[in-house]
Regions:
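Short beta-strand/loop motif that positions the catalytic acidic residue
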Residues: 232, 239-241
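Alpha/beta-hydrolase-fold enzymes
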Residues: 107, 119-196
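N-terminal cap/lid segment of alpha/beta-hydrolase-fold proteins
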Residues: 1-28
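The serine-hydrolase catalytic nucleophile loop
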Residues: 39-52, 66
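Conserved alpha/beta-hydrolase "acid-adjacent" motif
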Residues: 245-251
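Catalytic active-site module of serine/aspartate enzymes centered on a nucleophile-bearing elbow/loop
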Residues: 271-274, 278-297
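Catalytic nucleophile-loop/oxyanion-hole region of alpha/beta-hydrolase
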Residues: 7, 43, 69-104, 277-278, ...
């Protein structure tokens, strides 16, 4: 059973999709999971498969639209990780308010950018009883530098500095691309074969061509979950990495090595970054379900 819901974060009306077993009712006392999307993704793009897995396993899940995406209010397409972390924390509060949910059994699943954001939340919010981080981005600056030359990076930083001045004088950030296959006109650079496939992806179509703002680059510069990952303990954390992840490389290994127990690392053999979203969702979700059942049920 799926239900489109709304909740408020920082005064903005945000949207999400609540998924629950058909027999869920007031007093069911079911564990709940907040699903935290990746970069520029939405609740109804890629994530239904994750939610369906949780429903079948007896969980109530909330897949959120961050501010500025899907049906949520906010600056369209802008991705400021610390604000998204705030939105996800408020999603926990909403899930705790549901009569079907046990408020003391809440978990987080984050994918890609969301994979690092859930680490930030778990490090400071002990309402979270278990967390799973899938094909995560471990450091925003390191990811933005990937596939760029030093000169391209310097050019991008000059654009960011000019936009900082523009924002304080006009109140607006310049429009920018979320990702391109090269150059300095996007937040991220992706290999051409990935960029071409993403042009037809549902979430990009909904957001009209992966448009964001230059302020997003500034937000990513401050995003460094690798620096706080040791603070997640004693909350148990699972890392799911794709063996051939061409985007996030060894980020999961880095964070796993710095995290404290209880922790676990699962590798999707032969997998690439976007395999977890569809082709191999079932395989990637198996260790997540086992992890959450161990600590929540």
């Amino acid at each position: 059973m799926k239900e489109r819901i709304n909740y408020y974060s920082d005064g903005l009306k945000l949207s999400g999709i609540l998924s629950k077993p058909d027999n869920a009712k007031k007093g069911s006392n079911l564990p709940g999971v907040v699903l935290v999307p990746g970069f520029m993704s939405t609740a109804d793009a890629f994530f239904p498969g994750f939610a369906d897995e949780f429903t079948a396993a007896g969980f109530v899940s909330l897949t959120m639209d961050f501010r500025g995406f899907g049906e949520s209010e906010g600056v369209r397409g802008e991705v400021i990780p610390y604000l998204q972390i705030y939105d996800a924390s408020n999603a926990i509060s909403y899930l705790q308010s549901r009569p079907e949910v046990n408020p003391d059994k809440i978990a987080l699943l984050g994918v890609s950018l969301g994979g690092g954001e859930v680490a930030y939340i778990a490090a400071r919010d002990r309402r979270v009883k278990a967390v799973a981080s899938m094909v995560l981005v471990g450091d925003g600056e390191r990811r933005m530098r990937r596939f760029r030359t030093e000169q391209e990076w310097a050019t991008l930083m000059q654009k960011v500095q000019e936009d900082r001045i523009n924002r304080v004088l006009t109140g607006k950030s310049k429009d920018f691309h979320g990702f391109l296959d090269k150059g300095t006109d996007s937040v991220l650079v992706m290999p051409p074969e990935l960029t071409s496939s993403l042009k037809d992806a549902e979430q990009v179509e909904k957001e009209k061509g992966n448009k964001t703002t230059l302020a997003t680059v500034d937000g990513w510069l401050d995003y460094k979950p690798e620096e706080i990952i040791d603070k997640v303990a004693p909350t148990p954390i699972l890392f799911v990495q794709a063996e051939k992840d061409e985007l996030e490389a060894d980020d999961a290994d880095r964070l796993y090595n710095k995290a404290k127990e209880p922790k676990k690392l699962f590798t999707l053999k032969g997998g690439v970054h976007f395999d977890v979203y569809g082709k191999r969702t079932d395989e990637a979700m198996k260790p997540v379900l086992e992890w959450f059942k161990q600590y929540l049920q």
